[in-house]
């Protein structure tokens, strides 16, 4: 793989600023954000008043812990435009979550917010090894989902040539990669695996493509999956993080020269880690739930937003800004089985340690009697059908030994485990509703 480390002169000055400079900027921007939200968003005014705090109570960054959290339910209760802090006619675009479990969460952007968004995505692509003039194959979905357009405008701002393929039509994805010879692909990691499988089905060696780096996000993925994709594609696999409620993709990104966690662009987003039970902040280095406060958003400032993602805050390495560890799971996709907490990402790690099994899987929760049961659907790799049963038994023992729970491992025929051109549905809950 090529050395894609950016030249120090290409970085924004804030990326290498001192901690004191960065904290002073954060305090200034945080003070503005709290005042802006309090004055212009009735929800925040009511929430601050109920908590007995006002914007002027923020004297240090630690004082942010006195302010109330914002949850996805707050956004849904103020659907569609109740969280906007600017007049609606200043908003030039909206995005929204899928709304599969209720009303969608709507996010609005005036032109200045779109420019900030493009800036942090461009910074993320550059951190991943991208350069002006690179061809970028964008296989994130376009539409209300923030992935496609967020990646698109960030890549254009960096100076890339963007191929706006969107998701789906896997054969066409492979054809365009062959024809246009892109340097970069942006896509969900699970769909990248489907693209690799299609290349191999067509007799194309994935290692022979022009791709130098894949920027993968929108769902948790492990370092074992990184090794899998880098080995099969001979390219760098780099993580990008974001969520629509905060801005979209580009909140944090791995740096290609280290790949040791995702640098949070702290000049625009202030991170905290809190204990998901007590909701109290925990020191850097301890695992907990990731919480974000926006620092520069005008249309929809977000205050202490609970992401439900589990991670740790770590010191900066390639940049002076702090890093978050790869997301280990979500508080809302945690499976509790026989008193043991586990996450789909833990299952993924063990599948990737089982050579005869493909990296496609799905966890299915059922309750056949009085107790919950977890079934892990897996597939054999090409050429490993005859050894799949033994591999499944090995996986079952690995899960029992490493995680401490007994599961059923069900081997399906190649191609039977559900695929997705977007976020993979790793957990299906088929238990009866109470």
Language model features by range: what are they?
Residues 1-96, 101-119, 123-127, 370-377, ...:
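Nucleotide 5′-phosphate-binding alpha/beta core
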Residues 1-16, 67-238, 246, 250-261, ...:
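Active-site phosphate/ATP/adenylate-binding loop shared across adenylate-forming ligases
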Residues 162, 237, 271, 361-363, ...:
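Generic structural signal for residues in well-ordered beta-strands
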Residues 165, 240-242, 274, 366, ...:
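Conserved beta-strand termini and adjacent loop/short-helix elements that scaffold enzyme active sites
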Residues 185, 291, 295-403, 422:
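AMP-binding/adenylate-forming catalytic core of the ANL superfamily
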Residues 209, 265-268, 330:
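Short, solvent-exposed loop/turn segments at the edges of secondary structure
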Residues 221-316:
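Conserved AMP-binding/adenylate-forming
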């Amino acid at each position: 793989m090529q050395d894609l480390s950016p030249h120090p002169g290409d970085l924004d000055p804030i990326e290498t600023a001192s901690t004191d400079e960065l904290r002073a900027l954060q305090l200034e921007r945080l003070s503005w954000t709290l005042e802006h939200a309090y004055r212009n968003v009735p929800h925040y005014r009511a929430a601050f008043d109920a908590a007995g705090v006002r914007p002027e109570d923020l004297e240090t960054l630690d004082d942010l812990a006195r302010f109330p959290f914002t949850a996805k339910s707050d956004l849904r209760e103020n659907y569609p435009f109740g969280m906007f802090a600017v007049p609606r006619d200043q908003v030039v675009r909206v995005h929204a979550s899928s709304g599969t479990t209720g009303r969608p969460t709507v996010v609005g952007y005036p032109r200045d917010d779109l420019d900030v968004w493009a800036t942090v995505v461009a910074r993320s692509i550059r951190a991943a090894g991208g350069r002006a003039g690179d061809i970028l194959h964008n296989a994130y979905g376009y539409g209300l989902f923030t992935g496609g357009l967020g990646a698109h405008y960030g890549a254009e701002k960096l100076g890339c040539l963007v191929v706006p393929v969107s998701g789906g039509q896997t054969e066409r994805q492979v054809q365009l990669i062959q024809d246009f010879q892109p340097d970069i692909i942006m896509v969900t990691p699970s769909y990248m695996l489907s693209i690799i499988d299609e290349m191999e089905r067509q007799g194309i060696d994935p290692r022979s493509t022009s791709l130098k780096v894949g920027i993968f996000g929108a769902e948790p993925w492990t370092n074992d999956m990184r090794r899998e994709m880098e080995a099969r594609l001979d390219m760098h696999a780099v993580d990008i993080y974001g969520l629509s409620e905060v801005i979209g993709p580009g909140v944090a990104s791995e740096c290609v020269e280290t790949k040791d966690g995702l640098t949070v662009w702290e000049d625009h987003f202030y991170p905290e880690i809190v204990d998901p039970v007590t909701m109290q902040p925990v020191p850097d280095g301890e695992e907990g739930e990731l919480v974000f406060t926006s620092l520069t958003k005008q249309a929809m400032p977000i205050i202490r937003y609970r992401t439900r993602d589990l991670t740790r805050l770590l010191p900066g390495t390639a940049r002076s800004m702090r890093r978050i560890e790869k997301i280990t799971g979500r508080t809302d996709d945690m499976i509790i089985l026989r008193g043991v907490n586990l996450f789909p990402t833990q299952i993924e790690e063990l599948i990737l340690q089982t050579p005869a099994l493909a990296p496609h899987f799905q966890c299915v929760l059922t309750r056949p009697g009085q107790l919950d049961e977890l079934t892990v659907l897996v597939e054999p790799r090409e050429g490993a059908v005859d050894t799949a049963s033994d591999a499944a038994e090995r996986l079952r023992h690995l899960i029992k030994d490493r995680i401490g729970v007994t599961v059923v491992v069900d081997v399906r025929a190649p191609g039977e485990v559900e695929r997705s051109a977007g976020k993979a549905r790793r957990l299906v809950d088929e238990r009866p509703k109470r």
